[in-house]
Amino acid sequence: MVLLKFGINNFAGQEIFVIFAFNLLFKPMTEKLFTKSAFKVSLDCPWKLYYYRNPNLYFNANAENDFLESLAQGGFQVGELAKIYSHVDEDLKDIMDYDGSVRRTNELMKRENVCIAEAAFRWGNMFVRVDILKKVGNHISLIEVKAKSWDDTKDKFCSEKTRVVSSGVRSYVYDVAFQKYVVEGALKEQYSDQCFKVEAFLMMADKTKRADINGLNKLFKIEKDKNGRSKVVTAPDVVEVLNQGKPENHVITAFPVDGVCNAIIAGKTGEQGKDDWMLNLKFTEYVQLMAYKYCSNSRLSSAPLLSKTCFDCEYRKAKGQEDNLLDGWRECWLKHTTNSNLEKLSPIASLNGSGLNRDKWIKNGRYFMDELTYDDIKEYDPRKAGESGLDLYERKWLQISLETGNEELLERFKDKIVSPGVYLDVEGLKEEMATWKYPLHMIDFETTAVALPFYEGMKPYEQVAFQFSHHIIREDGSIEHAGQYLNEDVNEFPNFEFVRRLKVQLEQDKGSVFRYANHENSILNCIAEQLESSKEKDKDELIEFIRTITHHKDNGVTYAGERDMIDLLELVKRFFYNVDEMHGRNSIKQVLPAVLNSSEYLKEKYAKPIYGSVIKSQNIPADKPIAWIHMDEQDHVESPYHLLDNIGNLLGVTEEEMKQMEMNDSDADFQVANGGAALTAYNKLLFCSDEENASTGAITEKSTVPSFSEALRTALLRYCELDTMSMVFIWEYFKDNIK
C-alpha cells in the first residue's frame, strides 16, 4: 500500500510505523473510511474524532443540524447553482456506497472531457467526494462549493508575510487540500502511466457581484425524499432563466486556492507545527494518524488538550439530561479534573467578553472561577465620566462573586444585592430613566441574509428585513401592542416598505425608542445605504427618518439622531444581574426569565389573563386573552417563549435541532422561540416547496387547520410580538423597583 511507504519515509515515531503495518494485516469486518467530514471534525478537535466515529455511544447536539445550517445560509441553493453554472454532465449524489461511487467515477474519467458532481475517490483508507470535478484532457479542476461570502479584492486566503492560512477560511482551505491530497494519490495509484494536473478551487458567494436575476429563491426549492434526506428540486425553466443573466454577474465564483493547498500539503504554511494546531504535526503526518485512528476506531493515547473552544463542544450533555448516550466532553475534562469539581464549582466557561484569557487559564490548570485573581482579568471599556452603573470589568467580578459566593468579593456590590443572587442598581436606573421621553416605543426586527440574493441588484448575504413588532408604553403606564409588519409577499424586496411602515409607527410623537442590542441600528443603516442607490421616490424622506433614530459613522465621526434608539441590553449590563438565570448570558431569552423570577409584581400581574384584553394585542383576540405567567413544579416561572404555538412539525425539526438555532440559548421546545428559529422559519417559507411543507404532516388534502404558510406567519408574528413584550417586562421590572 502506498500509505505504508509514505508512513515509513515521513513519520518520525516508531509507533506510527507499526500502526500502519498493523492496519494492513487486519482489515475490519465493516469497512470505515476517513472522509472529508471526519477530517473536518479532527481539525476542530482531534479528540472529538472518536466521539464522531461512535454516534450510537456519544451524545451529539449537532447530529442532525446540517439541514438547519444549510437552510439558514442558503447552502443547498448554492450547491445546485454551482452545478448548473459548471455544466455538470452527471451527478453521483444518489450512489451512496464507496465502491459504487468510485466505480462510476472511474468510468466517467475515461472520457476526454467530463464534469462530474460528487465525484468519488479512494486512496488507501481515505475517501472523498468532490463537489464538482472538471476533467479536460489530463487537467482536472477540483471545486469545493461553500455558502460563504468572499471579496477577492480585499480578502486573502493566506498571509503573504507569515504564510499563515487565514483563520476565517482555514477549515475550508484545509478541506480542499485534503481532497487534493486524496485525489492526487488515487490518480497516481490508478493511472500510473498518466500524469494528471489537479488544480484546486473554492467556489463561494462573490461579494463584489450583484444579482441580475430576480427571484433566485424561486428556482430552487427544498424537499425531503422518502429516506428523509434533503434535496433541491430545480424549476423546469431554471437554465432558461439563469441564461437571462450575464456570466460576469454570476453571484458565485470559483476562487483559485491551488497554491495555498500545495503549501498545506507540503507542510509549509505558518500555522503548522505550533500552537497545538493538528497536534503540532505537519499535514501528511496528521492526516495519516487521524485516518488510522478513525478507521481502527481507536482513541488518541494522550490526554486531551483543553481550550476555550471546549466550552461549546457539541458532545456535552445538558445537566440532568437522561438518555443512554455518553458525554464526550465530560470524558475529556475528567482527564484534568475531578467529577466533584465539575459538579460543584463554577466553570470559567460562562465568563464571556473582552479582557479574558481563558486559554491561558486553562493551560495553567485553572478551570473554575474561584481560582481567578484580580490580575487575571484586564480592566477594559471603563465607564464614561459621570456615567452610572457597572462597566464590563466590574460586571465580570460581580458574576464571579455571585457564582462563587465569595464574601470578600461581594463586599463591593452588597449595597445593590436586592435579593439572593440578584443585583439591581436602583439609583443608577432612576437617574437613567428620568431622561426618557414618553410614550416609550419598544421595537424588534427579524432579518435574514443568505448566500443567493433573493432580488435583482442585491449582493450575496445582503440583509433583508422581513418583520418588526412595536409595543408602546404611555406615561400613565398603559401598554399596547401598537403595530407590526411581516412581509406577505416573499417574492418582493421588503426593505423599503419595512421602513415606511416603521416610520408610520414612530412618527406620531417624539417618545424614546428602544432596541435590544445593536441589530436594529445596523439594519436601519444598511437600509439607508440601499435607499441611497435606489430610485425610490421617497428615499430622501425615509433616509431622514432613519437618521433621526440611529447613529452612524462617517469618516470616523459618529453622528447620532435626536431620537437615537436606547439600547435596553446596555441598561441590563449596567444595572441588573440575576446569577441563577443568566450565568453570564445577556440575550433577551435569558434576561426575561431572570426578570420575571425576580419580580413578585410581574408574577401577580401577568398570572391573570389580561394580555389581549386589558393590554391590546395585534394577534391575541380580546375575547381570548392569555396569562404570561405559568409556574413549574419548582415554583419557577416558565419562559413565556415556551407558551408559543407548537410549530416544530412545520419546520420539520427535532427538539435537539431547535436547541441549536440560537447560539448560547437553550430553548428546547418546538416553538419559534429565538432569532435563529425565526430566520430558519422565514427561509423555509422562501425555499421549501409546497410538497415539502405539506410533508411535515401539518396539512392534508381535507385538513381544516391553517395552511403551512398561514400557520408559519402566525407563529412568526407571535414570536416577534413576544420579543417586544419582553422588553416591556424589563421596563416594568425597572419601573416597579425605582418607585
Question: Which stretches of residues belong to each language-model region?
Answer:
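Cationic, low-complexity basic patches in intrinsically disordered or flexible, solvent-exposed regions
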Residues: 6
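DEDD superfamily 3′-5′ metal-dependent exonuclease/proofreading module
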Residues: 10, 15-739
